[in-house]
Amino acid sequence: MTLLRIDGSYGEGGGQIIRTALSLAALTGTAVRLENIRARRRKPGLAAQHLTAVKAVALLCDARIGGAELGSQTLEFIPGRPVRAGDYTLDVGEAREGGSAGAVMLVLQTVLPPLALAEGASTVSLRGGTHVPMSPPFDYVREVWLPTLARMGVRAELSLVRSGWYPVGKGEVRLVVAGGRRSLEALKARHRGTLQAVTGRALAANLPAHIPERMAARARAVLADAGIAAAIEPAVLQAACAGAGLFLTARYDHCLAGFTALGRRGKSAERVAEEACGALLAHHRSGAALDQHLADQIVLPAALCREESLFSVERITPHLTTNAWVVDRFGLARVDVRLAECGTGLVRIHGNPAGVCHAHP
């Protein structure tokens, strides 16, 4: 059997290569071999959330896997059948003794595209870190990523059972995916239109109520100075450990954009607010439609469209170009990423009129 070889050290060289390759392998029935996984990282190889993603996608398509263990830099993934809808429970903590704050949102973004094209509805419970560094938080996925996918025909609902913060995790979310799609609808977002509203949530877990209130107040003040009114709700959550963060959503005529800042010991509530607001204002001034994170997260779904997707992005990042490279390696769609004169990017994803072609045995 010939396996498609994917160099895990290419470009950004992180976990996104693993996740995108797994999703596309399951969707197309392509057997893959990932090598040099996270080779340039301080702790190379598969981490807990990567291993959970491997096992989760393998469960969806009855894949045979080799090298699925913590720290492994080589992985073989051979799908056994088309993706099957069902009820699944995935625990990032199972991959490491004592639990993990591994990012469950990244695992969710790995399993959702295959389930969206499965024959029936699915329910997925995911346990681990819901608001952790280096990953989109629950609020971003629910308020920005999923609504953007809804424009592309994906019907899914996400709810928070309990929040999980770094370093303990132990949060839980529930995802319901309708399934039944043969392909997705192309995303057209070259121009974003007028800013309609900015909303947000200032959250703190196991911390005094004044912390989210201070984050919300400072964020409203910073945005007001820039001429933007914002409706930001402070809230205190229960969790297994303390945590705090501010999550902002900018709603334009034709798109959404999201911005996050997390707290940590020694970082003031006001600084958290200023960080999130700074990201929002930088995006707003760029004139682009998609924020830099949404752009790389939408490449894979756009590759599942029959028609061409086109969108502008605030900034071209290594995550974006690396994800485009992985999609190109599968031959499912061609991705063009170009730098515009103003420093923003323009992404064109040429759809596949034949749709997703399965090569399962």
Curated annotation (Swiss-Prot):
Enzyme Commission number(s): 6.5.1.4
Residues reported in the UniProt entry to bind ATP: Q109, H293, L294, A295, D296, Q297
Reactions mediated catalytically: a 3'-end 3'-phospho-ribonucleotide-RNA + ATP = a 3'-end 2',3'-cyclophospho-ribonucleotide-RNA + AMP + diphosphate
Entry annotation: catalytic residues: H319 (tele-amp-histidine intermediate)
Swiss-Prot/TrEMBL GO biological process terms: RNA processing
Alphabetically ordered keywords of this record: ATP-binding, Cytoplasm, Ligase, Nucleotide-binding
GO CC terms: cytoplasm
Subcellular location: Cytoplasm
Main enzyme class: ligase
The keyword Cytoplasm belongs to this UniProt entry's keyword annotation: yes
Record InterPro entries: RNA3'-term_phos_cycl_insert, RNA3'_phos_cyclase_dom, RNA3'_phos_cyclase_dom_sf, RNA3'_term_phos_cyc, RNA3'_term_phos_cyc_type_1, RNA3'P_cycl/enolpyr_Trfase_a/b, RPTC_insert
Gene3D superfamilies reported for this sequence: RNA 3'-terminal phosphate cyclase domain, RNA 3'-terminal phosphate cyclase, insert domain
Database matches in Pfam families: RTC (PF01137), RTC_insert (PF05189)
Major site of localization recorded for this protein: cytoplasm
GO molecular function: ATP binding; RNA-3'-phosphate cyclase activity
Similarity comment text for this entry: Belongs to the RNA 3'-terminal cyclase family. Type 1 subfamily.
HAMAP family: RTC
Annotated function: Catalyzes the conversion of 3'-phosphate to a 2',3'-cyclic phosphodiester at the end of RNA. The mechanism of action of the enzyme occurs in 3 steps: (A) adenylation of the enzyme by ATP; (B) transfer of adenylate to an RNA-N3'P to produce RNA-N3'PP5'A; (C) and attack of the adjacent 2'-hydroxyl on the 3'-phosphorus in the diester linkage to produce the cyclic end product. The biological role of this enzyme is unknown but it is likely to function in some aspects of cellular RNA processing.
Name this protein carries in UniProt: RNA 3'-terminal phosphate cyclase
Organism of derivation: Methylococcus capsulatus (strain ATCC 33009 / NCIMB 11132 / Bath)
